[in-house]
């Protein structure tokens, strides 16, 4: 894939997102099971991390290419594929805004679950996803929803309150969680509005440890939270941020045995 100057590369190579992804495996497998993937399908998984959805796609027999901007996550994904004996799955470093090394109309399914939504230039991202999808085939996105009361939207909201203002021209990733924005971006890429559909869905974060231990994992391994703590520490508000997140995780935990926290997202299906 092509080299990138995308500033998100440093963000997602920070920490070790595989530690957070490990809490999302069950939901990733469940989501993939809803997508009608069959043996031999060509699947592009954008912003794939270490394979939370790419691995179950390959286990269903699809030929899967996982693309992620973070070199460490690509390496972790390829290690998982090798360990699992999945010769039909490979991971490559790349940028969702520039898939120029991939041929037009070459994939039966393009999927991006909490991945491409974080890329800058959302119109460019939509255009590239449409370009590489075969006619009559699908794009599926999972996008966090702005101001949603569940976990991830609240983590991002709380973290933003402790962080410096974003640079001029910054487009928030959660704008992908607004249906009107999604329609605007894909229609600009040539898709008819009536070919775009939406559904609210749920991803759960499951961990054997306590909610406070899961907060510690986010603080240690999740780039956006790590940045928020660095900014909070510079202003003497590190303990305040810690307390807010621990309260959030504790209130949203649904089990007495470890931690299980559901988070609502917008599932987008685009039929080319």
Where does each model-flagged region fall?
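Conserved class I S-adenosyl-L-methionine
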Residues: 1-41, 52, 76, 83-84, ...
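C-terminal helical/coil "lid" or tail adjacent to the Rossmann-like core of SAM-dependent
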Residues: 3, 9-13, 195-256
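Class I SAM-dependent methyltransferase SAM/SAH-binding core
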Residues: 42-99, 124
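A short acidic, Gly/Pro-enriched loop at the edge of an enzyme's catalytic core
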Residues: 97-109
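A short SAM/SAH-binding and catalytic strip from SAM-dependent methyltransferases
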Residues: 108-123, 145
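Helix-to-beta-strand junctions that scaffold the AdoMet/dcAdoMet cofactor pocket
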Residues: 119-120, 133-135
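Conserved catalytic/acceptor-binding region of the Class I
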Residues: 123-124, 130, 138-209, 225
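Core SAM-dependent methyltransferase catalytic element
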Residues: 189-191, 264-272
């Amino acid at each position: 894939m092509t080299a990138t100057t995308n500033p998100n590369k440093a963000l997602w190579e920070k920490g070790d997102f595989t530690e957070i992804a490990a809490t999302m495996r069950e939901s990733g497998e469940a989501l993939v099971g809803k997508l009608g993937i069959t043996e031999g399908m060509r699947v592009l998984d954008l912003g794939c991390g270490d394979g939370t959805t790419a691995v179950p796609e390959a286990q269903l027999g699809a030929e899967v290419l996982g693309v992620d901007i973070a070199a460490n996550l690509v390496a972790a994904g390829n290690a998982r594929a090798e360990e699992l004996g999945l010769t039909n799955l490979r991971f490559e470093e790349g940028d969702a805004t520039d898939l120029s090394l991939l041929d037009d109309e070459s994939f039966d399914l393009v999927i991006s679950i909490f991945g491409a939504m974080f890329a800058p230039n959302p119109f460019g991202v939509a255009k590239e996803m449409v370009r590489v999808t075969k006619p009559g085939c699908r794009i599926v996105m999972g996008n966090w929803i702005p101001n949603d009361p569940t976990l991830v939207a609240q983590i991002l909201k709380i973290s933003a309150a402790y962080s410096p203002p974003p640079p001029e021209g910054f487009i928030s990733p959660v704008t992908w969680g607004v249906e009107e924005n999604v329609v605007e971006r894909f229609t600009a890429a040539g898709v008819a509005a009536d070919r775009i559909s939406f559904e609210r869905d749920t991803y759960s974060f499951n961990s054997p440890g306590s909610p406070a231990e899961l907060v510690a994992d986010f603080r240690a391994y999740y780039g956006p939270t790590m940045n928020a703590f660095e900014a909070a520490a510079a202003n003497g508000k590190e303990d305040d941020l810690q307390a807010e997140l621990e309260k959030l995780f504790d209130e949203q935990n649904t089990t007495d045995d470890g931690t299980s926290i559901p988070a609502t997202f917008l599932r987008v299906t685009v039929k080319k």
